[in-house]
Every structure is written in C-alpha cells, then in structure tokens.
UniProtKB/Swiss-Prot annotation:
Organism lineage: Bacteria, Pseudomonadati, Pseudomonadota, Gammaproteobacteria, Moraxellales
GO cellular component: cytoplasm
Family matches, as CDD domains: Orn
Domain Exonuclease: 9-172
Superkingdom of source: Bacteria
Database matches in Pfam families: RNase_T (PF00929)
Function: 3'-to-5' exoribonuclease specific for small oligoribonucleotides.
HAMAP family: Oligoribonuclease
GO molecular function annotation: 3'-5'-RNA exonuclease activity; nucleic acid binding
Full protein name: Oligoribonuclease
Species whose genome carries this gene: Acinetobacter baylyi (strain ATCC 33305 / BD413 / ADP1)
Keywords, in A-Z order: Cytoplasm, Exonuclease, Hydrolase, Nuclease
Length: 183
C-alpha cells in the first residue's frame, strides 16, 4: 500500500444513548477520511445501530429530545444492524483508505468515543493509532489564549454523526487559519 495511506486522517463520530461508557450504547457512527491538509478524500457510511426500546426509553431527557428531533431514534428503531455489523462495515471502509495503526482518532471530545469503542467495538478501536487528534483540546487553548477569535467560529451542532465530523474538520481548519501562527 502507498505511503499516502499512512498520512491520511480518520475522522469519526459516535452518537450514544448517553455518556456513561459502562452502560450506554452506540446508536450511530460515521467516518470521513482526509489528507493531512484536511481535504476530504472519502466519506464512509453513516450507520445506525439497532437498539431495543428498553435501551432507548432509558435515555435521559436531553438525548431523547435531541435524537428524537433529529430523526435518529426512528432510524435506530428501523435499523437491522448490530454494533458488530456496524463495526465490520466501518472497518471495511477504512481498510480501503488508511493503513492500520497509522491515523490518530480524529474528532471532537474523541476520548469519549474511544472509550465506547473500546467496550463495544474493540476491533475498530484497535485500527487507530494510540494517539488522538482532538479538536476540543485546540478549542480549549484558543478560548484561553485567543478568545477574540472564538466569535468567528460557526458550528452546525446537529448531533448527527456525519454533520458533527464535518463541523470538526471545519473547526480545525478555522483554528489553522486564525489560531496557529504562520511563518
């Protein structure tokens, strides 16, 4: 495989029934591959993971409202895919574009996603390099060191996995332009 596959970045986002990594479940996953300059190379499948009503009915008010309004709960109910099905389909996509263990896990607050994957999709979690490219870390630095640039940042915040990834890529491009020093 070409060295290009060693420099590409895997962007991933999960939507979950909540934030409890020991008990909550993954309900949606999406991936995007970019080159090292953040240009989109490929978009992966957007997959809803079926969950029974007892899991969906246990969601807190925020998740119930957010995922209900976005249509995600209905997609989850209609889905026939298990977490393992979704894991395998995502891996099949990634293997076409990026060599194993070369890309950090990229996204916003990605540690939470990694913890869910470790428990529910371990093979997928192991496909990534151990490092993370967490845009939320850059945001925290920008808020403290250059707060004046934050008003120019616009995000969609739909809490649908593919939209959230696009937002994360756009956000990092924004920080590259307005936060990082160019020589």
């Amino acid at each position: 495989m070409s060295s290009t596959q060693d420099t590409r970045l895997i962007w991933i986002d999960l939507e979950m029934t909540g934030l409890d990594t020991d008990n909550d479940q993954i309900i949606e996953i999406a991936t995007i591959i970019t080159d090292d300059h953040l240009n989109i190379v490929a978009e992966g499948p957007v997959l809803a993971v079926h969950q029974p009503d007892r899991i969906l009915n246990a969601m807190d008010e925020w998740n119930t409202r957010q995922h209900g309004q976005s249509g995600l709960i209905e997609r989850v109910r209609r889905s026939k895919l298990t977490a393992r099905d979704v894991e395998l389909q995502t891996l099949e996509f990634l293997k076409k574009w990026v060599n194993p263990k070369t890309s950090p896990m990229c996204g916003n607050s990605i540690c939470q996603d990694r913890r869910f994957m470790h428990r529910l999709m371990p093979e997928l979690e192991q496909y990534f390099h151990y490092r993370n490219l967490d845009v939320s870390s850059v945001k925290e630095l920008a808020k403290r060191w250059r707060p004046e640039i934050m008003s120019g940042l616009k995000k969609n915040a739909s809490h649908l996995a593919m939209d959230d990834i696009r937002d994360s890529i756009s956000e990092l491009k924004y920080y590259r332009e307005y936060f990082f020093i160019k020589n």
